[in-house]
């Protein structure tokens, strides 16, 4: 991925989600296995992929609150550099969540 190019919807790996939630990837795997976390979608290679909305859901399940800061940090590490676009992306997901 180019450092300044935003894809329409960022996808996260289990490792990314573990960093965001401050847990190990094994913890996430165990919680999925025990049905405490919903099973994520899979990509063409059958790897688990998590959307931004999935990550917010897991934050709510884990901590009963939403905090976009660790998500922004991981997105930045993945090459998302445009903070304005990151803000719009996160605001868009949060706005949709409030409307539901």
Regions found by a protein language model. Give the residues of each.
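Polyanion-binding surface elements
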Residues: 2-31
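Short helix-start
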Residues: 11-14, 38-63
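Major-groove DNA-recognition helix of helix-turn-helix-type DNA-binding domains
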Residues: 22-48
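A short, Lys/Arg-enriched interface patch at domain edges and termini
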Residues: 55-85
């Amino acid at each position: 991925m180019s450092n300044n190019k935003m894809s329409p919807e960022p996808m996260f790996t289990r490792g990314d989600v573990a960093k965001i939630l401050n847990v190990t990837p094994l913890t996430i795997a165990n919680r999925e296995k025990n049905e405490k976390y919903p099973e994520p979608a899979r990509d063409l290679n059958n790897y688990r992929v998590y959307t931004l909305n999935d990550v917010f859901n897991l934050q709510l399940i884990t901590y009963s609150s939403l905090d976009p800061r660790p998500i922004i940090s991981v997105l930045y590490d993945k090459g998302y550099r445009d903070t304005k676009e990151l803000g719009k992306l996160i605001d868009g997901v949060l706005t949709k969540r409030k409307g539901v």
